[in-house]
UniProtKB/Swiss-Prot annotation:
Pfam families: GIY-YIG, HHH_5, UVR, UvrC_RNaseH, UvrC_RNaseH_dom. This is UvrABC system protein C. Residues 16-95 form the GIY-YIG domain. It comes from Nocardia farcinica (strain IFM 10152). Residues 208-243 form the UVR domain. Interacts with UvrB in an incision complex. The UvrABC repair system catalyzes the recognition and processing of DNA lesions. UvrC both incises the 5' and 3' sides of the lesion. The N-terminal half is responsible for the 3' incision and the C-terminal half is responsible for the 5' incision. Keywords: Cytoplasm, DNA damage, DNA excision, DNA repair, Excision nuclease, SOS response. Belongs to the UvrC family. Its main location: cytoplasm. One of its GO terms (biological process) is SOS response. It is found in: Cytoplasm. It comes from the Bacteria.
Length: 673
């Protein structure tokens, strides 16, 4: 890897104007493209403190061998140039929100003499118009079946079309009036194309106009006493209305908007977008990709979300307009809506809004919904994004091949003697030194073993509003492994005693008590009978050193210890000055992150429970024989603990279930407080 100092531009040579920059590797390939309001400020951030950069950004900077830039006059020009370069060079370190091929769309082959309607998955093609994407293929087929009654366009493949053209008979759809049968000349190419164009207009959102036109023709046919045509048109109107009912009305009529939401963790981001046209959700799509680029170095919270918004909108709408330019009869205004609803406005959103307006050809409004139906829909999209990220992580975690690869990668990266089939992880949780607790979670074969989870209330390393995270890690480690050390010592003494007495050697299965960690009554292993292959602490070098020191004191040498720092996802090993950096997309890092996050979740849950109990505790809790029901009855009867404290024994005994002895004990506890 290259040293960034070898290609860092000389001081004062980087301009302060807005522009776009490119990092190239030693082969001259562009590996990253970014834009900046101030090129000097942005590029200097890559070289000032390389160690503090996000791991993926750090990898990019150390992979690069040179950097170059282009100055532009406005930030809008920078947006456009950045998009063009990303599209041209396809840099490996830029996030690409490529269309998810798993989402089906309805394709219309307008580039053919007789356009065809069909369900499609795959890359976009020139001359084909697409509607969707939809969540399920059956939803497209169901809607298409309804609309073919009104718009009897061709749906067959090229081979089927040619065969029926040769035999001179239409297919079944032609006989039931769900195809205009252009294969046998029932309609001309121009008439068939007109049917397809009406179909496209309907799906594009011009629904009310189409329904009104059919109703007008229906009434005209009835007035002319052409009841057969009127009945057919009536059925067509009903079919259109049924198709419309399948698209939920979520916003006001005439509303065209895209609603976008994100869900993130330290490594990945899930994006969901709902396409609303004429107040109805016409399509939905989503992606889960690795975090990359400027967004990961923007901090957390609103700054990160704003950077993700800018990154996504620039690439997504740029590509959608490019697709529209390749498709006849589709204008940029159909893919860039009048309104884009996002969770957070990025810095300099006015320039982004101007760029989107240029793409559309008319004004585009970029805003964060605050209330009403738009806010509710934005929350729905956000829930979808969170669910997509959770499902993505669950799918990876549940895959046996991925788990096996993760364990093998961890073994190789940390130079372990064997794969860490049992991993234990510790996390500390507190609020300003109060209610300090720890959690210990267990993963076996890459899956959580929740029956072995443990909580710890920190005793020695916390108290009086202080908390020592390093000391807390040491305390938990000592409490966890002290029993293991004790059982091993007892087993060694028993073995020595047996050998000294000349006891015969017997099989382990016959004498379960001779083995450490075995319950003498059941012969089964205790839950913590075996040490972990890998012991993970949440933190960096100090926490790892504390845990390793405790294990050395206890004489436990067969447990590997590492630390996983939260933000940078660095793996710290005892005695090593530099962390181990696992590839960001590796199964090993994903598993370690999941173990750490589970320990964090479990610790927070216990911390909140302990804090809640403390905040609701009272002197009544210390009264022997006074349960929760009678404590509640006392407080309810007197209205508060203060009034109960002022009551007499006789007044307290008026409460059902409270005797004289209990009443005296209550008053004694309250006055002692």
């Amino acid at each position: 890897m290259a040293d960034p100092a070898t290609y860092r531009p000389a001081p004062g040579t980087i301009p302060v104007e807005p522009g776009v920059y490119k990092f190239r590797d030693s082969y001259g390939r562009v590996i990253y493209v970014g834009k900046a309001k101030s090129l000097r400020s942005r590029l200097n951030s890559y070289f000032a403190d390389v160690a503090s950069l996000h791991p993926r950004t750090k990898q990019m900077v150390t992979t690069a061998a040179s950097v170059e830039w282009t100055v532009v006059s406005t930030e809008v020009e920078a947006l456009q140039l950045e998009y063009n370069w990303i599209k041209e060079f396809d840099p490996r370190f830029n996030v690409r929100y490529r269309d998810d091929k798993s989402y089906p769309v309805l394709a219309v082959t307008l580039n053919e003499e007789y356009p065809r309607l069909f369900v499609y998955r795959g890359a976009r093609k020139k001359g084909v118009r697409y509607f969707g994407p939809y969540a399920h293929a059956w939803a497209i087929r169901e809607t298409l079946d309804l609309l073919l009654r009104v718009f009897p366009a061709r749906t067959c493949s090229t081979g089927v079309f040619k065969r029926h053209n040769q035999i001179g008979r239409p297919c079944l759809l032609g006989y039931i009036d769900k195809c205009s049968a252009p294969c046998v000349g029932r309609v001309s190419a121009e008439e068939h194309r007109a049917i397809v164009e009406d179909f496209c207009d309907f799906l594009a959102g011009r629904t009310d106009k189409m329904v009104r036109e059919l109703e007008r023709r229906m009434h005209a046919a009835a007035e002319d006493l052409d009841f057969e045509t009127a009945a057919r048109l009536r059925d067509d109107v009903q079919a259109l209305r049924r198709a419309l009912e399948k698209q939920a009305v979520v916003l006001g009529t005439g509303t065209d908007a895209d609603v976008i939401a994100f869900a993130t963790d330290e490594l990945e981001v899930a994006v969901q977008i709902f396409h609303v046209r004429d107040g109805r959700v016409r399509g939905q799509r989503g992606w889960v990709v690795d975090k990359s680029g400027d967004a990961v170095d923007s901090g957390t919270g609103d700054d990160e979300t704003g950077a993700l918004v800018e990154q996504f909108l620039t690439q997504f709408y740029g590509e959608q307009v490019a697709y529209a330019d390749q498709t006849p009869d589709e204008q940029p205004a159909t893919v860039v809506p009048r309104e884009v609803l996002v969770p957070q406005l990025p810095a300099g959103h006015e320039q982004l809004q101007e760029w989107l307006s240029r793409l559309r050809g008319s004004a585009v409004r970029l805003r964060v919904p605050q209330r009403g139906d738009k806010k509710a829909l934005a929350e729905t999209v956000e829930r979808n994004a969170k669910e997509a990220l959770a499902q993505h992580k669950l799918k990876r975690a549940g895959d046996l091949t991925s788990r096996s690869a993760a364990l093998q990668d961890i073994q190789d990266a940390l130079d372990l003697d064997s794969a860490p089939l049992r991993i234990e992880c510790v996390d500390i949780s507190h609020v300003q030194g109060t209610d300090v607790v720890a959690s210990l979670v267990v993963f076996e074969d890459g899956l959580p073993r929740k029956s072995d989870y443990r909580h710890y209330a920190i005793k020695e390393a916390a108290g009086e509003g202080r908390s020592d995270d390093v000391g807390s890690i040491a305390e938990v480690t000592r409490r966890r492994f002290y029993r293991l050390r004790k059982e091993r010592d007892e087993a060694e003494r028993d073995e020595l005693d047996g050998t000294a007495a000349g006891a015969p050697l017997v099989d382990d299965d016959e004498t379960p008590t001779s083995r450490p960690g075995i319950d003498p009554t059941t012969g089964r292993p205790r839950k913590f009978a075996y040490p972990p292959n890998l012991y993970v602490v949440d933190g960096g070098a100090p926490q790892v050193a504390a845990a390793a020191e405790v294990l050395d004191e206890l004489g436990i040498t067969d447990v590997a210890v590492i630390g996983l720092a939260k933000r940078l996802e660095e793996v710290w090993v005892p005695g090593e000055p530099d962390p181990v950096i696992l590839p960001r997309n590796s199964e090993a890092l994903f598993l370690l992150q999941r173990v750490r996050d589970e320990a964090h979740r479990f610790a927070i849950t216990f911390h909140r429970s302990k804090r809640s109990r403390r905040m609701t505790a009272s002197a009544l809790d210390s009264v022997r024989g006074l349960g929760a029901a009678r404590r509640t009855a006392l407080v309810t009867h007197f209205g508060s603990v203060a009034k109960l404290k002022e009551a007499t024994v006789e007044e307290i005994t008026e409460v059902p279930g409270i005797g004289v002895a209990t009443a005296k004990a209550v008053l004694a506890a309250l006055h002692q407080e």
